[in-house]
Amino acid sequence: MKILGIDTSSMAASVAVIEDNKLICEYTINTKKTHSQKLMPMIENMLGLSDLNVREIDAIAVCEGPGSFTGLRIGMATAKAIAHVNDIPVIGVNSLEALAANMNLCDKKIFSILDAQRNQVYTGRYQYEGTKLVEIKEIGIQQIDELLEELAHSGEQWILVGEAVYKYEDKIREISNIEIPAASNNVTKAGSLCSVAKVKFDEGKDIFDCYTVNPLYIRKSQAEEQYEEKQRKLQEQK
């Protein structure tokens, strides 16, 4: 079974193909180019270098969020289009679980964090039970200072993974029971995304078609929140 993975949930764009449990190719770019500029050329180049035709792909694994609202929409639209044309399923994987999968078979508890702005982070907690990655607590959103205080007093060893690590690195390094992994593990890799998707497919979980898969938004976008605040103030003035 060949799975094409697509992740555009952050500044980095990543695509990959796995066949069963073997990584065939992975292509990650972290530049200022927009995802709309680079995503399709990345997919086409990767498939070409791998001597693969898109018709050989059996399923699409797409990062459903949380993450950049614009990035998620671009990745999701691309996944839907490829799935529609080739009549193949789409497997949704959240970005926090895919990040945790970068720490394959880690013996510590894994805390995935992504920047949610306003000193907040999207959070996901995971651990490996044997070879299986297990969610400890549902994904959510939390103030970074509250989160770090909670982990500092947890009495457990944690690995903190994700792009938000860099934003709050000075604070994180002050806490002795938190470890920061190598830089390459702090971006969502499409290869890890595909590995999580393969497990989900085998278990019959989170499998959609091109019409039913949608981004996972933990909260409303800033534009939506500003609009609602404006409407609330207008109502109060009446």
What positions do the PLM features span?
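Acyltransferase
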Residues: 181-238
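Phosphate-handling active-site elements
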Residues: 50-55, 84-95, 205-206
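Short beta-strand scaffold segments in enzyme catalytic cores
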Residues: 12-18, 121-125, 216
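Short glycine-aspartate micro-motif
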Residues: 3-5, 61, 71, 110-113
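DPxDG-like acidic metal-binding loop motif
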Residues: 59-90
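N-terminal beta-alpha supersecondary unit
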Residues: 1-64
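Surface "functional belts" at beta-alpha junctions
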Residues: 22, 34, 89-187
